[in-house]
């Protein structure tokens, strides 16, 4: 994965996630729109097989980079939780 910041202001962030698909972007978007600091979160992928998605975040004034970092941390926590639950189920 390669992430390029296309634009950033105090409350907006637009990033291109090279090589990513709907899988990661849907998870990020869903977590971001549940965050009370986020006013708008969406991504655009013009052509699924040949274009890289662009994620857009607008916050209430909170640093959008911190908001995106928090969403990434939540994904890691959810994956860790799934790994634990899955391991217990398999070993039961």
Swiss-Prot record:
GO cellular component terms given for this protein: cytoplasm; DNA-directed RNA polymerase complex
Report whether Chaperone shows up as a keyword of the record: no
What GO molecular function terms would the record report?
A: DNA binding; DNA-directed RNA polymerase activity; protein dimerization activity
User: Which GO BP terms sit in this record?
Assistant: DNA-templated transcription
Q: Which UniProt keywords apply?
A: Cytoplasm, DNA-directed RNA polymerase, Nucleotidyltransferase, Transcription, Transferase
What the entry lists under CDD domains is as follows: RNAP_L
- Identify the PROSITE patterns for this entry: RNA_POL_L_13KD
Chief location of this protein within or outside the cell: cytoplasm
Q: Which SUPFAM superfamilies match?
A: RBP11-like subunits of RNA polymerase
State the function annotated in the UniProt record: DNA-dependent RNA polymerase (RNAP) catalyzes the transcription of DNA into RNA using the four ribonucleoside triphosphates as substrates.
Quaternary context: Part of the RNA polymerase complex.
Q: Which family does it belong to?
A: Belongs to the archaeal Rpo11/eukaryotic RPB11/RPC19 RNA polymerase subunit family.
Could you identify this protein by its name? DNA-directed RNA polymerase subunit Rpo11
Question: What are the top taxonomic ranks of the organism?
Answer: Archaea, Methanobacteriati, Methanobacteriota, Stenosarchaea group, Methanomicrobia
- Gene name of this polypeptide: rpo11
């Amino acid at each position: 994965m390669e992430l390029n910041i296309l634009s950033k202001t105090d409350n907006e962030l637009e990033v291109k996630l090279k090589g990513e698909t709907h899988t990661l972007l849907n998870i990020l978007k869903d977590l971001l729109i549940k965050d009370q600091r986020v006013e708008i979160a969406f991504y655009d992928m013009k052509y699924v097989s040949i274009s890289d998605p662009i994620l857009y975040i607008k916050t209430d004034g909170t640093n959008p980079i911190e908001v995106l970092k928090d969403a990434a941390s939540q994904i890691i926590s959810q994956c860790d939780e799934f790994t634990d639950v899955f391991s217990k189920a398999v070993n039961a």
